[in-house]
């Protein structure tokens, strides 16, 4: 970890990050966790519109995230970094965001079974795990298993800004559990300088390789 700290300052020093996060691709030019999220949301919207560049770009459809009152990140909210990329539901005339249901006896623990029902109903294009107030692990593996079994096309992202220094056996290994994208800041539980990072679990042969190329651009 000391060696990683000494090399993380340079934008080209992505190898230690790939080893630490356990993913094949990392972007380190972003300067904060919020910028990491903005770059990811922008890339997702651009990738969604990749086959039609003649018309007004469509924004992201439904997004599933943690409610800010339950510890969710501000940058993952419609009033945060997500605001320029999220669609408006034409029926409700509200932003197309739904929140993870929580357990009645633990308001900071996601109710997995109820979440499955929400996903089945709204078919979110993006699922954002992660909180600024973390008391429990996020059920990444359980939700990945469900969307795979139900063949629901979505992208699973984990904003680890506040827990990036806890990646590993004692907390969570997001990519092993099924996350596709991990964002974070390097100056909270991870003891680095003021920077951001984006890691993805995409390879050249994957359908979403183009999404990674868009994130890089």
Regions found by a protein language model. Give the residues of each.
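Conserved PLP-enzyme active-site core in the AAT-like
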Residues: 5-26, 31-217
């Amino acid at each position: 970890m000391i060696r990683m700290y000494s090399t993380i300052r340079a934008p080209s020093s992505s190898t230690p990050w790939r080893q630490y996060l356990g993913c094949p691709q990392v972007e380190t030019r972003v300067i904060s966790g919020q910028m990491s999220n903005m770059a990811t949301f922008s890339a997702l919207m651009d990738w969604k519109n990749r086959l039609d560049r003649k018309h007004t770009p469509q924004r992201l459809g439904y997004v599933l995230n943690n409610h800010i009152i339950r510890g969710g990140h501000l940058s993952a909210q419609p009033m945060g970094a997500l605001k320029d990329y999220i669609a408006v539901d034409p029926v409700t005339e509200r932003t197309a965001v739904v929140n993870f249901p929580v357990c009645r006896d633990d308001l900071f623990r996601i109710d997995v079974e109820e979440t499955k029902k929400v996903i089945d109903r709204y078919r979110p294009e993006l699922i954002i795990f992660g909180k600024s107030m973390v008391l429990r692990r996020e059920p990444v593996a359980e939700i990945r298993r469900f969307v795979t079994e139900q063949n629901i096309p979505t992208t699973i992202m984990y904003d680890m800004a506040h827990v990036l220094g806890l990646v590993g056996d004692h907390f969570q290994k997001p990519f092993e559990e099924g996350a596709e994208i991990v964002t974070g800041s390097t100056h909270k539980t991870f003891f680095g300088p003021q920077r951001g990072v984006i890691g993805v679990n995409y390879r050249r042969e994957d359908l979403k390789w183009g999404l990674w190329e868009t994130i890089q651009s």
